[in-house]
A protein has these predicted regions:
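Conserved, mostly hydrophobic/aromatic
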Residues: 30, 54, 76, 108, ...
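Charged (often Lys/Glu-rich) extended helix/loop segments that serve as interaction or gating elements
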Residues: 258, 263-418
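Structured core elements
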Residues: 71, 94, 114-116, 137-139, ...
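Flexible loop/turn segments at secondary-structure boundaries
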Residues: 57-60, 101, 145-146, 191-195, ...
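Active-site loop/helix belt of alpha/beta enzymes
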Residues: 142-288, 351
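A charged N-terminal "starter" segment
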Residues: 1-115, 120-134, 175-181, 213-215, ...
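Glycine-rich, aromatic-flanked loop segments that form ligand/cofactor-binding clefts
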Residues: 131-145
Length: 418
């Protein structure tokens, strides 16, 4: 059974003030997670966590992480702009993008962000847009499949991201010739891994590559970015990742590979998003309909526009009935109101007997939840509420209104007949 970070009485008080559906975040949990990550990697003097903004692009959340010493990993102009408006200095902004417009390279350079080049061909784009900066990173894709033991974790060879090894070496040589002085590498090989072995294996590949870069190019890397990929236990029967154990595995490989090669000062960076935020957010929704045909359907006031992952990936998110957490079980589909049959949060899920009006919590939506929202069927995006460390509920993003939906349209008078 998954635990919620809020009890029934607390949730009912919040719902009395803010109508469902909404995304709810736990400030205490977010701060504790950031501190745990920083403590786990404290053995590395230059360690920095650059939170993946794409996971939860909400200023109030980014400010919490900033206060805990995190930087930001941006992938677009607006994410860069948001980070700048929140007073993240360029040294705390990593710009990891792909198929990047020239204006975004120019803006990233203007801010002093570290650019992580996705493609060998991007050298030309970057030079044309802003010149070659002194600090530069390149993204590596080893190709093939990524395995841990006998398990295939992912297939980098089919990913659109990164450079081949030959391209990487040529890129570093060219960038050095064009004036770059400080170098780093980055790689992302698997998503949402629930194992303490992923980071150490990725680290080994990148550390050995760093040694080879030093020997063949005479370039001492300043940092190695392990990016993201550490996942969360969406299912209650999964063991959560232990970041201290994961970091210890990385440290052992660091001392085995980098230190003997004279690279014992290399900084370790991470770009965790899901691991940092997912467990500390939930989608709160109310049951509005109950329908029985060939199955039993619980209709809720949230839909895939509020949480796309189950519809898009078939992803599992645990669901807790906060109103009636116990009782005789029934097998149900939990569904939204979109005109799409994949608008389902759960399929053939066993839940306690549920009635219209019950409050449901959909777990682990703190990352890639609100951020993946959209407006199909002219649905409006929901509010975001923060449970503060003081036990208060604070709205950090209001729900969209109809006038927001029409705000960008020309030739349409929203106020007509009023």
């Amino acid at each position: 059974m998954k635990k919620t970070f809020i009890n029934r009485e607390e949730l009912e008080a919040i719902v009395a003030e803010f109508p469902t559906p909404f995304h709810l975040y736990d400030e205490k949990g977010i701060r504790e997670k950031a501190r745990a990550v920083n403590q786990a990697f404290s053995w590395n003097q230059g360690f920095k966590e650059y939170f993946a903004v794409k996971a939860t692009p909400t200023p109030a959340i980014l400010k919490i992480l900033q206060e805990e010493g995190c930087g930001v990993d941006c992938s677009s102009y607006v994410e860069l702009l948001m980070s700048h408006k929140l007073d993240f200095p360029g040294s705390e902004i990593m710009f990891s993008s792909n198929n990047t417009p020239d204006k975004e390279y120019a803006y990233a350079c203007e801010l002093g962000a570290t650019i992580n080049l996705d493609a060998f061909e991007d050298i030309e784009h970057l030079e044309r847009a802003a010149g070659i900066p002194e600090i530069i990173s390149c993204r590596y894709n080893p190709g093939g499949v990524f395995e841990l033991g006998t398990d295939i974790m992912d297939n980098p060879g089919e990913a659109k991201f990164g450079m081949t090894k030959d391209q990487l070496f040529e890129a570093f040589a060219i960038l050095k010739e064009k004036g770059a002085k400080t170098f780093g590498i980055h790689s992302f090989l698997a998503s949402n891994t629930v194992t303490h072995l992923y980071y150490p294996e990725l680290a080994r590949q990148l550390f050995e590559l760093a040694v080879e870069i030093k020997e063949k190019l005479g370039i001492w890397l300043d940092f190695i970015n392990l990016s993201g990929g550490i996942g969360v236990n969406y299912r209650p029967d999964q063991e959560p990742n232990d970041i201290a154990l994961i970091s210890e595995g990385v440290r052992k490989v660091y001392e085995e590979v980098l230190t003997p090669a004279g690279l014992g000062q290399v900084k370790i960076f991470t770009e965790l998003g899901r691991f940092m935020l997912a467990p500390h957010g939930a989608l709160v929704t109310r049951v509005t309909h109950k329908k029985k045909t060939y199955r039993t359907y619980l209709g809720v006031d949230a839909s895939a526009v509020n949480l796309m992952r189950p519809a898009m990936y078939g992803a599992y998110h645990h669901i807790t009935n906060m109103t009636h957490p116990e009782g005789p079980a029934e097998v149900v589909d939990v569904v939204g109101s979109l005109c799409e049959n994949n608008d389902k949060f759960a399929v053939n899920r066993e839940l306690p007997h549920t009635e219209i009006g019950d409050l449901l919590v959909i777990h682990d939506t703190g990352a890639h939840g609100f951020s993946m929202g959209y407006q199909y069927n002219a649905k409006l995006r929901s509010a975001e509420i923060l449970c503060t460390e003081e036990g208060k509920a604070r709205q950090i993003r209001r729900a969209e209104r109809p006038e927001d939906y029409f705000a960008t349209l020309y030739g349409f008078d929203f106020d007509k007949d009023e």
